[in-house]
Amino acid sequence: MDIQRLYAAFKECGRVTTDSRAISGGELFFALKGENFDGNEYALKALDAGARYAVVDEKAGVAASGDPRLIAVPDTLAALQALARHHRENTFVNGRRLTVIGLTGTNGKTTTKELITKVLSVKYNVTSTQGNLNNDIGVPLSVLGINSGTQLAVIEMGANHPDDIERLVKVCEPDYGLITNVGKAHLLGFGSFEGVKKAKGKLYDYLAEHGGSIFLNADDRDLVAMAAERKGLNVIDYGIEYWGAMVLPSDAAHPFVRMAVPESAENLLCLETHLAGAYNATNIAAAIAVGLHFGVSLEDAIQAVSEYIPKNNRSQLEKTARNILIEDAYNANPTSMAAALDNLASVHAPLKAAMLGDMRELGEDSVSEHVAILKKLVSMDLDLVCLVGEEFRKALSQVDPAAAHWSGTSDDLAAWLKANPVSGHTVLVKGSRGIRMERILSEL
């Protein structure tokens, strides 16, 4: 593969897409292949729609068409990743290589990334991962979004399998790293909690090998132990307890996360957010720590965090005509589910309900982890519990919380809620992405 030719095409285009339907004119189109699609079949359509060039597999039939706008490569995904790495290595700010902050973790990745971006944007032109484009395709696309005006980049990396982070750090080559936390998620791919730590720890491994720095939550014993195992890391500590900060209690007048952050030994600054759930305090602390390191004042960092409004059903709090909803329906695993329930337990409300969907990709631990959540629900004595999915159905044979209603799908639960309206409750809505728990929100 001629990386120089490919990079010249990219510089000429400036924009990259893998979706032929998203062509607006002038893009570099990559014909990726998946289980149910082959982008090579859409390469000519992409060119007709206005793409300037299309990168295709050299063995695909379209490669023989002779169109000079086609760039044939052995593997289009590998070419996309190689192009991103080359772009990262050849992007400079004031004569120095662009600084990249790499971010991963079991929970809170996207929220933390958004908060970091918000804080750093006070002082810098920041390019960061859009949404949760954090996989083998999303990370190179994020890196290729870096432009001549970028002063700092924040790249989110997700992982479902042991070698995912190891591959992704080679694409974005971070100078700084931050692991939000490590917990029980994607156990089907990682095999165990130790497997999760080993996989996420590849970010620390890369930075240790390359003289990089990490932002370390000094309150998190797992992360502290992981960092201690790796020599050569420059550690920048932060943490709620480490700083002597406080998470203030929520109430009806202050339903969102509030914190008191020490400006000095004598003075605390109050921070009020639009984030639901005390578990977000560590995400906020991470963003403040990154901002402080890069010269953003504490006052400006607090102001930036206070202005951040979550979206896409991530730690959102919504007051409807009938209920108060804690919407955290984007994803779920045992660690984040337990944290969300702890937060619900801390809320002062006359009536409380939990509407939970299955936690997926837990492998042989699935039933036991769902049983653990049911036991937690029993201890909370909620006014209403609604459960969705086959994994919860299996767990219900071992533990059956009082006032629990089970549905096979979120659509089934939505229909039940329509027939049995819920009013006056504070309701937690959470589940794995595939369960689509957001479909019940209109009935609440």
Language model region names:
Residues 4, 60-66, 178-324, 349-350, ...:
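Acidic, Mg2+-coordinating active-site environments of NTP-dependent enzymes
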Residues 34-37, 310-313, 329-402:
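Active-site beta-alpha connecting loops in nucleotide-dependent enzymes
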Residues 103, 109, 312-314, 434-442:
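ATP-dependent carboxylate/acyl-activation modules
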Residues 79-218, 222-233, 419, 443-444:
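Phosphate-binding loop of NTP-binding sites
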Residues 43, 47-48, 169-170, 345, ...:
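Non-catalytic positions within long, well-ordered alpha-helices that form the structural scaffold/packing
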Residues 2-102, 111-122, 144, 397, ...:
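Short, basic phosphate-binding NTP loop
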